[in-house]
A protein has these predicted regions:
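Short hydrophobic alpha-helices and adjacent helix-cap/hinge residues
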Residues: 2-184
Length: 184
């Protein structure tokens, strides 16, 4: 009788271990089953991070909120940026505004556009994902290659607009134009 109780207990322990292994494995399997981050969400996250490593000229310094204007972008991109609304950047809430191609950019600290920059936007961080965006006057281009988003920073355009990037950011990017002395 003692032997039977031990045998039953061994089966219970074995079953419990199997159940425990299944419970431990299930979250991993679910995480693997979830889709990867979408390209628009990744680009929005990169722009959000860029804002943390950017310094605006004194006259354009955000006082209350930091305004990110998304100009003439596809709906998926607008939704990805709207998800960032109210998040804090440099101690200020981020305010996302979706604008048309001809809308006024007054009050925008960051301008994201999916088309090459058609006009100069002094004192603002312009970011885009159009081919050659940074080469044609934008401050930061987001290039997609081999399923990766790469940064291209136009230091000359940024310097002429009074926008400064941290040296940490510049180390992660392909730099176009002259690198400022002192690495900053």
């Amino acid at each position: 009788m003692i032997r039977e109780e031990c045998a039953g207990s061994t089966r219970s322990v074995g079953w419990a271990r199997s159940a425990l292994a299944l419970v431990a494995f299930l979250p991993c399997a679910l995480a693997l089953a979830q889709p990867a981050v979408s390209e628009p969400a990744l680009k929005a996250a990169i722009v959000f991070t860029l804002a943390k490593f950017t310094e605006w000229p004194a006259q354009q310094q955000p006082t209350d909120a930091l305004s990110l204007c998304v100009v003439a972008a596809p709906e998926q991109m607008n939704a990805a940026f709207n998800a960032l609304d109210s998040k804090l950047v440099q101690g200020r809430p981020l305010r996302v505004r979706v604008l048309g191609a001809r809308d006024d950019l007054a009050g925008c600290h960051i301008v994201f556009a999916s088309a090459p920059p058609a006009r100069t936007v002094p004192g603002r961080l312009t970011v885009g994902d159009a081919p050659r965006f940074a080469e044609t006057g934008g401050k930061v281009g987001l290039l997609t290659a081999n399923d990766r988003v790469q940064l291209e920073v136009n230091v000359s355009a940024a310097t002429s607009a009074g926008v400064k990037f941290s040296s940490q950011l510049l180390r992660l990017a392909r730099v176009i134009g002259e690198q400022p002395r002192g690495g900053g």
